[in-house]
Amino acid sequence: MGTLQSWRRAYGALKDTTKVGLVRVNSDYAELDVAIVKATNHVECPPKDRHLRKIFLATSAIRPRADVAYCIHALSRRLHKTRNWTVALKALLVIHRLLRDGDPTFREELLNFSQKGRIMQISNFKDDSSPVAWDCSGWVRTYALFLEERLECFRVLKYDIEAERLPKVSPGQEKGYSKTRDLDGEKLLEQLPALQQLLHRLIGCKPEGAAKHNHIIQYALSLVLKESFKVYCAINEGIINLVEKFFEMPRHEAIKALEIYKRAGLQAGNLSAFYEVCKGLELARNFQFPVLREPPQSFLTTMEEYMRDAPQMVDVTSGPLLLTYTPDDGLTSEDVGPSHEEHETSSPSDSAVVPSEETQLSSQSPPSVETPQNFIDTDDLLGLHDDTPDPLAILDQNALALALVSNDVDSSPFSFGQARDLDPSGWELALVTTPSNDISAATERQLAGGLDTLTLNSLYDDGALRAAQQPAYGVPASNPFEVQDLFAFSDSVSPPSAVNNPFGLYEPTYHQQEQQPQLQVAPSPANPFGDFGEFPIVPVSEPQSTTSFGAFPVPVSEPSNTTGFGEIPVVPVTEPPNTTAFGEFPVVPVSEPQNITGFGALPVTPASEPSNTTGFGEFPVVSVSAPQNTTGFGALPVIPVSEPSKTTGLGEFPVVPVSEPQNTTGFGEFPVNAGAHEQHNSNNPFGSTGFL
């Protein structure tokens, strides 16, 4: 067992040394962190004063509040991360010493920090390293609850019990008294429960088991005993003050005072038992324990008898009470006031509250005053001086309840209240018209049942609105997700292009011509490299094409196209001409579309198998039964019988299809006769081999 304890002490010392080295390197408050680690090390002894003085200096009023807050945060982190009861108890001891002997700035910052979370809430703390540690862990938890309640008591009392200096009652009396002796009844009922709860936590710090004989626990218990004397003194002085004010309190306050008095008697007995336990410890040599006496039972019985006869709480207003005077009733100023039935049957003018001087003047006036027939009081248009009318009277006089209105209209004179109920537009008309005492015009406008023209028109308008809002049968329901057109208010005005086409702003300046099922003549797009001239398209029945070598008529049924280099007839069948960025090169696709490259227009017309070209030039190959092949030394075109003529970008080479087609090149004409077996001709690059 001794070896295990020695190993644990060595391990704790190693952890403390490592922690000190780490905080010296990594912490911005190295000196404060080192003092906190050394004051809360694993050694079972009270914190040393030299380490406490450094912590007191860091939390003094001359230091910034940020340093005080960092100290509280470091102590809280040290308390909640440890699993050793010695480190936890020494951290609580440092906090207790700062609350007792430290600057008030620390208490204020600790209150602000406790609002975010309880710093000393360690109800789950437990050290299972040994049976002694088990008992000590229980006392550490009760000690933390006492410190937490001490902080809460400071929040209620607004002052610290331990820091309170007890004044002398008189020069010849040595015993002082607490602030609770001079409190009024309301504050006394607020502060005494907080002090009694603090005393309850203090009595709970009674050590048990192995914790009674631990040296560091007895050191912390001595601090608790010192505070118990002042806490009990404050409660005792408050009870004396409470007893003096008890017989002057109303019933609800007397009930609270009686509960406080009963709890004080019970706590006196518990505190005496706590002192008896402490007297058996070594620390009892430094303390002189007071003798506590419980309150007499006879006085408690007297207080309970007073509670049965105590008056109820009555709220009496300080202002003068105004009574309503009615001439018909023989009430005097000593009566309480008119009954509820008389209050309901009285007229609005009689129920108005008037001062006492006007009451005396009204007693001398006649008991009733005749109200003119056509008189309306315009001073009270909203009826603020009138009481709430009877619902049955409103139902009988309601002009909108047509089913309840009789046909017989009473033409007798009516008072102002009746005119107001029958005319639903009373105060609205009075706001827009000149005040007048004559209501004959309004009476003439009224119809049967008390209705007037304005009310009747409003009923018709309301009926038309309800009919318009009713759903029509057979009409498809509207789509709730359909977005309404912003320009639907006018069909004659077309909306701007930005609404119809939101992408119109981002379209390029040139547009590609769409393919049409019929032959169309479209304007040529602009050439970015310059315009070589106009290229008219003239449809003829049999156009003739010419070159620099001669005229070569080509009978076609479609119009010919020309370019800036010469006339190159191209017969479009179904597809429009295509252009590139280097110029206009019309290509007429027969069954397959033409392909173009970046070096120029190389039209390829597939018959059964399309022609092939190379990078040295254009070599169209037209296959009849077996297609012709060309070489890189010259173009050997073979034109089938039923196929149109082909052109290139180097010049115009018309080919006239006959029963036996002829082939030409740029150096001359080379006729080729096609029979059962097709002949292949080749050109001599140094001259022509035959002429027609």
From Swiss-Prot:
Tissue: Expressed in the whole plant.
Annotated segments matching region Disordered: 325-383
Region (8 X 17 AA approximate tandem repeats) residue spans: 532-666
SMART domains for this protein: ENTH
Record localization: Membrane, Clathrin-coated pit; Golgi apparatus; Cytoplasmic vesicle, Clathrin-coated vesicle
Protein keywords: Coated pit, Cytoplasmic vesicle, Endocytosis, Golgi apparatus, Membrane, Phosphoprotein, Repeat
Any one GO biological process: clathrin-dependent endocytosis
UniProt name for this protein: Putative clathrin assembly protein At1g14910
Protein's organism: Arabidopsis thaliana (Mouse-ear cress)
